[in-house]
Amino acid sequence: MAVERTLSIIKPDAVAKNIIGEIYNRFEKAGLKIVAARMVHLSREQAEGFYAVHKERPFFNDLVGFMISGPVMVQVLEGENAIVKNREIMGATNPAEAAAGTLRHDYAETIDANAVHGSDAPETAKQEIEFFFKADELCSR
C-alpha cells in the first residue's frame, strides 16, 4: 500500500458549526495524519481558481459564493491510500445519499453545503495541495 497525501477542506458550513475538532478526530481515527493545516477566508479569485475545473458547470457561481461565505479549514492528510480513505470518511457528495457514520451524513445539510471537500485522484491531490501549500509547509510525521 502506498503512503499518499490528499487535500481536505472543511467548508464554511462545518466551520460555522464549530466541528473542526470532531472532523479531525475522524481523520486521525482512520489512520490519517494532518501534515499541514491553515484557516483561510477565500477571496472570490481564490475560490474561482481552485474550482476552475467546474467553471462551465451550472453550479459554479453558487459553489464559489458558498466557499467565500465564511472561513474554511484547509489541511493535507497523509497515510496509506489517503485519497480513497478520505473519500470514504467524507461519504457521498449528496448528504441524503451518504452512508451513516460518514462526515456528510452526520454534518452536512445539502448537496451544496456538504461540509467537506477531498481530492479525488493523485493528480488532483498534487495540484490542490500546491494551490494552498508550499513544499516546505508540509511536515511529514
Curated annotation (Swiss-Prot):
MF term (GO), any: ATP binding
Ranges that cross the membrane: none
Needed cofactors: Mg(2+)
Keyword Magnesium applies: yes
Catalytic activity field: a 2'-deoxyribonucleoside 5'-diphosphate + ATP = a 2'-deoxyribonucleoside 5'-triphosphate + ADP; a ribonucleoside 5'-diphosphate + ATP = a ribonucleoside 5'-triphosphate + ADP
Subcellular location(s) of the protein: Cytoplasm
EC code: 2.7.4.6
SMART domains: NDK
Residues at the catalytic site: 117 (pros-phosphohistidine intermediate)
CC annotations in GO: cytoplasm
PROSITE patterns in UniProt: NDPK, NDPK_LIKE
Entry keyword set: ATP-binding, Cytoplasm, Kinase, Magnesium, Metal-binding, Nucleotide metabolism, Nucleotide-binding, Phosphoprotein, Transferase
Entry coiled-coil feature ranges: none
Family affiliation: Belongs to the NDK family.
Physiological role: Major role in the synthesis of nucleoside triphosphates other than ATP. The ATP gamma phosphate is transferred to the NDP beta phosphate via a ping-pong mechanism, using a phosphorylated active-site intermediate.
Assembly behavior: Homotetramer.
NCBIfam families reported in the protein's UniProt record: PRK00668.1 (NF001908)
Protein name: Nucleoside diphosphate kinase
